[in-house]
Amino acid sequence: MSFIPVAEDSDFPIQNLPYGVFSTQSNPKPRIGVAIGDQILDLSVIKHLFTGPVLSKHQHVFDETTLNSFMGLGQAAWKEARASLQNLLSASQAQLRDDKELRQRAFTSQASATMHLPATIGDYTDFYSSLQHATNVGIMFRGKENALLPNWLHLPVGYHGRASSVVVSGTPIRRPMGQMRPDNSKPPVYGASKRLDMELEMAFFVGPGNRFGEPIPISKAQEHIFGMVLMNDWSARDIQQWEYVPLGPFLGKSFGTTISPWVVPMDALMPFVVPNPKQDPKPLPYLCHSQPYTFDINLSVALKGEGMSQAATICRSNFKHMYWTILQQLTHHSVNGCNLRPGDLLASGTISGSDPESFGSMLELSWKGTKAIDVGQGQTRTFLLDGDEVIITGHCQGDGYRVGFGQCAGKVLPALSPA
């Protein structure tokens, strides 16, 4: 138990301690903090209290404006930091609890803070690792007989996204303009996307990277994974459908990707590990791992339209539905010698279960726009309207506590007028 009061339904008990980057009106410099209850502990203020064998030599990483350097220190530093923080925040420890002057400088209410991206994201890769999602999309566009492409059950399919347009929760997303071909009997047209969608995803940040030309074996992959966030991979389906052959997504995805600001460390998620999904056929040896490494994370998506008094939940899913694990994703990404770096972001792909209510995109929930999605108060949707706010939340449920991720939210702004 912490000396900081934490409600039972708080996302941020002492069992969590996620890392983020924040600023305040009184101190506009972005700095590294840890969430506890409704407070933020400023690590730049208490860096001198990290006196373990690793961090005593690297206290300066907590003076930086991003988590990249801390991410790059590796598991020994992360575990040492977590143990120190849990000790300092414990109700039985006086060092921080009883130092009123230090406490006053070290803690900030989350309500008064502005959150920033937790890391400088050098590269962003999006995978396509939900069997149900891949099957659903395949049925819609290719038919039931050709739902899965031949490679899907053999490797974690992915594509390189646009790191520059990854934004932190709360950043508005402008409806994109682009080229579409709504009528195959007519030439393509240019205009605002009419099929703007959300995608329920999660993502993980890379810790230490690998040298150029040297793959990360799956037995070592866990050592390179710092922590996880929620993600909304906004998608313009009409732009995407016209452009994606033969090289895959481009402008239909690159206009905006939202992540939650708090990075939940993997050690906070390990109590919620569950068996990996059965993979048939068995993957090639470089992708095989026996240790469980997927997680029971309850996920939900809510939509709040303009004029709606409250948001309506349109999807409930779970991260455990993923077919390919994050260890497999990381290893496959590096198998050709591609070098990953601290702060790189690797995303899961849309998270869909077998139940229609667990489908993680409006493309699936509306079945390509043929079914209305009830969002309450007499309103329905097939795709997103201007003014709609999408709010993704997620948590692991423990005994009397929960390890949560906060919110991943964004509101749709109207498209700019064509030039």
From Swiss-Prot:
Mainly in liver and kidney. SUPFAM superfamilies: FAH, Fumarylacetoacetate hydrolase, FAH, N-terminal domain. The active site is at H133 (proton acceptor). Keywords: Acetylation, Calcium, Hydrolase, Lipid metabolism, Magnesium, Metal-binding, Phenylalanine catabolism, Phosphoprotein, Tyrosine catabolism. Ca(2+) binds at D126, E199, E201, D233. Mg(2+) binds at D233, K253, T257. The modification Phosphoserine is found at S84, S92, S309, S417. Its EC number is 3.7.1.2. Pfam families: FAA_hydrolase (PF01557), FAA_hydrolase_N (PF09298). Its cofactor is Ca(2+); Mg(2+). The modification N-acetylserine is found at S2. It is an enzyme of class 3 (hydrolase). GO terms for molecular function: fumarylacetoacetase activity; metal ion binding. Pathway: Amino-acid degradation; L-phenylalanine degradation; acetoacetate and fumarate from L-phenylalanine: step 6/6. One of its GO terms (biological process) is lipid metabolic process. It catalyses: 4-fumarylacetoacetate + H2O = acetoacetate + fumarate + H(+). InterPro entries: Fumarylacetoacetase, Fumarylacetoacetase-like_C, Fumarylacetoacetase_C_sf, Fumarylacetoacetase_N, Fumarylacetoacetase_N_sf. Substrate binds at Y128, R142, Q240, Y244, T350. Belongs to the FAH family. Homodimer. NCBIfam families: fum_ac_acetase. This is Fumarylacetoacetase. The gene is Fah.
